[in-house]
Amino acid sequence: MKAKRMTDLDLTGKRVLIREDLNVPIKDGQVADDTRVRAAAESIRQAMQAGGRVLVMSHLGRPKEGEYDAEASMAPVARRLGEILGCEVPVVRDWLEGVDVPEGGVALAENVRFQPGETKDDEALSRRMAALCDVFVMDAFGTAHRAQASTHGVARFAPEACAGPLLSAELEALGKALDNPARPMIAIVGGSKVSGKVQVLEALTHKVDQLIVGGGIANTFIAAAGYSVGKSLYEADFVDTAKRLMEEARAKGGEIPIPEDVVTARDFSADAEAHVHPVDAVPDDEMILDVGPQTRARYDGMLRNAGTVVWNGPVGVFEMAPFAGGTRALAEAIAASDGFSIAGGGDTLAAVEQFGITDQVSYISTGGGAFLEFLEGRVLPGVAALEQHAAAHS
């Protein structure tokens, strides 16, 4: 990354505007999951300890732009952030008028999406945000794929713009996994539809040694290999795409392995009776909901010997006990591997948590959509703006 880093700058007495991703679930006026708040608090604390006069901004939910909505107020987030930091964090409603924060202090701007023009990357709004600071810090990887006033526009006009500790760590880990990976490199891409992840599959097919596919995506590849998938969810329109990707992987010496055996059931339910079948013998009235024991053993061997693993998506319906075995086997193999592993995406993080391997994954990515776009090789506007700023002010 060619952007400046917050840790390289002198923040003493400076007005520091930090864009964090504090978009967390709120239940009964309380933060229901504070993972993002705790992660952001570390960056905020660093800026405060460096003598910055810190104003934090974030979006929360999807309120109607340009209108105040008490339901989407940052107040519950400010309370939780204050508990973590050990100080009061005031929420400032009219923050665009200017906020007087003492040196080493912090305030939280009310929801940026209450400002008209935020999601449209409005130049006038971006300039007003930039006027509030001496240093703009982009630290929200989860929103870096969106060109909005608080993630992109403000960086164009701020006197100084840099990457915060969270964003820097995220880009470093992704770079390590994708730019110069230790081999063999394995990617796991799960999900219900090939159509939703076709760019990721395309990009990774040409980068990795093995690409393990899971969920409804795997069913489309099983159909492409010429097998019946019974009444499983799959996309007939993408069978040719799957065939092409398998051929392209083989042509470069890699592979997209097809499951040898699968776990099926007649109904999509946690009480359904699960059966194991070879992949060429799936009954017409059953659906594939997980990979079978032979396939798990094969994936286990591949993953334990991997130099790099990129994990995005489960291989079965892991939320239901009869169909959790495949994803559990992946999780345990990744945990046991000496290779560098990175996991991202909501379902993947839920699986990492469920199978208790959080501490054994080398890096857990906080960005859902941004993680996918990075895997696709796309330019993230929030990062590009920092790099352009650094180039213009070098």
Curated annotation (Swiss-Prot):
GO MF, one example: ADP binding
Q: Which reaction does it catalyse?
A: (2R)-3-phosphoglycerate + ATP = (2R)-3-phospho-glyceroyl phosphate + ADP
| Record's subunit section | Monomer.
Q: GO biological process annotations for this chain's record?
A: gluconeogenesis; glycolytic process
* UniProt: ATP binding residues: K197, E319, G345, G346, D347, T348
> What pathway is it annotated to?
Carbohydrate degradation; glycolysis; pyruvate from D-glyceraldehyde 3-phosphate: step 2/5
Matching InterPro entries: Phosphoglycerate_kinase (IPR001576), Phosphoglycerate_kinase_CS (IPR015911), Phosphoglycerate_kinase_N (IPR015824), Phosphoglycerate_kinase_sf (IPR036043)
Family membership: Belongs to the phosphoglycerate kinase family.
Q: What class of enzyme is it?
A: transferase
Q: Which gene encodes it?
A: pgk
> Which positions bind substrate?
D21, L22, N23, R36, H59, L60, G61, R62, R113, R146
A Pfam family recorded for this sequence: PGK
For this protein, the Enzyme Commission number is 2.7.2.3
Name the UniProt key words of this record, in alphabetical order.
ATP-binding, Cytoplasm, Glycolysis, Kinase, Nucleotide-binding, Transferase
Give the domain of life: Bacteria
Q: Does the keyword Chaperone apply?
A: no
Q: Which organism is it from?
A: Halorhodospira halophila (strain DSM 244 / SL1) (Ectothiorhodospira halophila (strain DSM 244 / SL1))
State where it is primarily located.
cytoplasm
What's the protein called, per UniProt?
Answer: Phosphoglycerate kinase
PANTHER family (UniProt xref): PHOSPHOGLYCERATE KINASE, PHOSPHOGLYCERATE KINASE 1, CHLOROPLASTIC-RELATED
Q: Where in the cell is it found?
A: Cytoplasm
- What GO CC annotations are associated with the protein? cytosol
